[in-house]
UniProtKB/Swiss-Prot annotation:
It is an enzyme of class 2 (transferase). Residues 1-22 are annotated as: Disordered. Ubiquitously expressed at very low levels. Residues 1-15 have a biased composition (Basic and acidic residues). It catalyses: S-ubiquitinyl-[E1 ubiquitin-activating enzyme]-L-cysteine + [E2 ubiquitin-conjugating enzyme]-L-cysteine = [E1 ubiquitin-activating enzyme]-L-cysteine + S-ubiquitinyl-[E2 ubiquitin-conjugating enzyme]-L-cysteine. Keywords: ATP-binding, Nucleotide-binding, Transferase, Ubl conjugation pathway. It comes from Arabidopsis thaliana (Mouse-ear cress). Belongs to the ubiquitin-conjugating enzyme family. Its EC number is 2.3.2.23. GO terms for molecular function: ATP binding; ubiquitin conjugating enzyme activity. The active site is at residue 86. Pathway: Protein modification; protein ubiquitination. This is Probable ubiquitin-conjugating enzyme E2 12.
Amino acid sequence: MASKRISRELRDMQRHPPANCSAGPVAEEDIFHWQATIMGPHDSPYSGGVFTVSIDFSSDYPFKPPKVNFKTKVYHPNIDSKGSICLDILKEQWSPAPTTSKVLLSICSLLTDPNPNDPLVPEIAHLYKVDKSKYESTAQKWTQKYAMG
């Protein structure tokens, strides 16, 4: 079941790629391990950055969410230093309905609109709330250092 669903999503994504994203298997013979590329949204401090994300599907997919992690360092209240992402649709709000394409679009939205009320990194969330311009300049510096090379 999982491999059929993943194969179908891959075909759909190749036909209709999500905006500013691409994804596919790391190795042709292993459909369960993907690498994605997310372009930093223009209306965010991540603009101009290219972010690599790993997507690991289990044999229980789509009944369990894929494990999605940033491989590129990113300064964000909902993404920690290990690349873990705090996004409700990858946790308690998961349902079998969303496709990988929709998950990637949700991650792009999170880059544009962080959720400081449900942070993985409380210090960054605090800065976002009290000094947004300092948060944005730090995020831009990290983007230049880690995602533009």
